[in-house]
Amino acid sequence: MANTLSFDQISTVLNDIVKQATGVETMKATDTSSFVAQAQTALLVGNDRIMNSISQVLDRTIFSVRPYNAKFKGLRRTTQQWGNHVRKLGMLDDDWENDQRQPLDDDTAVDMYKIKKGKVLQTNFYGGQVFQRHRTYFRDQLDQAFRNPDEFGQFISMYTQNTMDMIEQAHESMARACVANYIGAKNIWQASVTASTVGYTGEHVVKLLTMYNTENGTKLTAEDVRKAENFPSFYKWACAKIMTYMDFFTERTTRFHANITGKEIARHTPLQMQNIMIFSPDLHTADTTVLSNTFHDQYLKIATNEKVNFWQTLESPMNINVTPSVMTPDGSVEKGEAQVMSNIFAVLFDEEAMGLTTINQWSSTTPFNSAGGYWNIYYHFTDRYWNDLTENGLVFVLE
């Protein structure tokens, strides 16, 4: 599992996450603590004996593939090639002292050699997740399926590009799960603060709809607020509220992150180090119903780092259902309670609050198999997907 010194096999959960992201499976509880012609498959001629999906040549072949670029690029961080332990150091504030210049009495001395060691907070990130993929390349068994070497070359290009696309989507899907884990962990902290659980402090989840209804004397639900007569005014208000929090992040405070008991640390996040992810359908609605009707467009154009089409699955795009890893007030990490959340609108966070580090990646080709007439190419990855709850971050929900 994560948060140990080992590098864990992640293929099972990776397959699960990718299937949910691509719609192969519907949303289910995911343990992120561990992370007009219709096409048809019916084939009316003989198949190649090796691949069993390539028709023997008839007239022409369309090679259906295009490069895929992974989303959540904003989570990529510096590559760490050596070791499996990364530490992060931060300074804690000291109390101010009385000025020793006064009073000064006769027969007394001022000690200027008093020792005062600074207080340091060290947080640690351990381990990583390992996974692999491999593909087989045949020497001549596919010759009967193509008309000439050029067409065979196009097939190999498509074949290889498909491998690259799957690798890109694997990183994207795990990065999406990293965000979902962060949202779930922040929700655990907010629930514990609300319940006055000892050691839990700060503000972690902002209920935009509750605040809006309180300030405006309305009783709108998440469904009501998206109606044409309500959405423009709500979105303008929500943008102003989020930008206010963005300004708050620039203040040096202990308010917007988790603190370790006895080692409270003041954080500030300059605007250029703030990232925001916003649910894209609401952003597109705003583009057509709100932004075009304002005199000062820049007022509502938040510098969005990433538009998010869905947080976990396309089937339920605004929802998550995860069992996150979470840091507790004593600084340890535990597997939290399952978090089922809906109506997630946006996530605002310090660039060091979460991310993806590819520790190592490489590929290698096997020797040619003379008996079988093929060779394999293996792709290996060691990734670390991480959250740091001691950095500033807020989750905005339509509740």
Model-derived regions, located:
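Short glycine-rich, low-complexity/disordered patches
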Residues: 29-31, 68-75, 172, 186, ...
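Extended, solvent-exposed, turn-rich assembly/linker loops in the middle of proteins
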Residues: 188-322
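Charge-rich, solvent-exposed alpha-helical interaction surfaces
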Residues: 53, 57, 158, 208-211
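Generic detection of short hydrophobic beta-strand segments and adjacent strand-loop junctions
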Residues: 137, 206-208, 396
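Alpha-helix boundary/N-cap detector
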Residues: 5-12, 41-45, 49, 53, ...
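Long, contiguous amphipathic alpha-helices that act as assembly "spine/axial" helices in icosahedral shell
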Residues: 121-192, 376-380
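Extended, compositionally biased alpha-helical segments that mediate assembly or anchoring
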Residues: 1-68, 284-399
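Assembly/oligomerization interface modules of large self-assembling protein complexes
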Residues: 51-135
